[in-house]
Each structure stands twice: as structure tokens, then as C-alpha cells.
Amino acid sequence: MDIKMLDYVVMIAKCESISKAAEKLYLTQSGLNQQLLKLERNLGIKLFERDHHHFRITDAGKIYVRNAMEILRIQRNTLMQLSDLKNNICLLYTSDAADD
């Protein structure tokens, strides 16, 4: 499983619709649906209940989405911290070079 799939499932849950989520993610509805079905097969559990008129998140889906959101938050924070560190190292290096 990759980070993209976490984003996909979170968006599906927020939109309560694969078609709306696919539109926001710039994906085809069928492509997103196939990704979701593949994930559910791999997990061995349904994340969403669906029929022609309804699309509801399951209890397992709620757990998955809650944890996916936490993982995505940690990833964003980590990338920001690394970016800040990189910028500080560049500033320090530039500052030291200017002192010579």
C-alpha cells in the first residue's frame, strides 16, 4: 500500500461518493473504484458499503480513515521539518561562506 491509497480512501470518505472523489483526485471513477476494490481484497474487509443509491463507510472504514489521516498528517509534518532543516543548513552554509 502506498501513500496515494491513503489519500484516495480519505477523499472517498469525505465525499461519500467514488465519483465525486475521483473528480477531486483527477482520476476516473472506474480506476478509483478498482483501486478501492483491490485494497479491500488485500485487507480482507470492506471499508465501504455500496449499492445503487447509497455509499456508506463501515466501522472498519472509519478505523482505516482515522489512521490514514494520522499517517498523512505525520507525513506532511515530517516533510515540512525536513524542508525547514534543509533551508537552515543552506542558510548556515551560505552564511559561513560569506564570512570567509
Model region roles, listed by residue range:
Residues 86-92:
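Immediate post-signal peptide segment of exported/extracytoplasmic ligand-binding proteins
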Residues 93-100:
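Conserved small/polar residues in nucleotide/adenosyl-binding loops
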Residues 40-59, 79:
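A short LG(V/I)-centered, amphipathic sequence patch enriched
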Residues 42-43, 64-86:
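Alpha-helical linker/hinge and terminal dimerization helices associated
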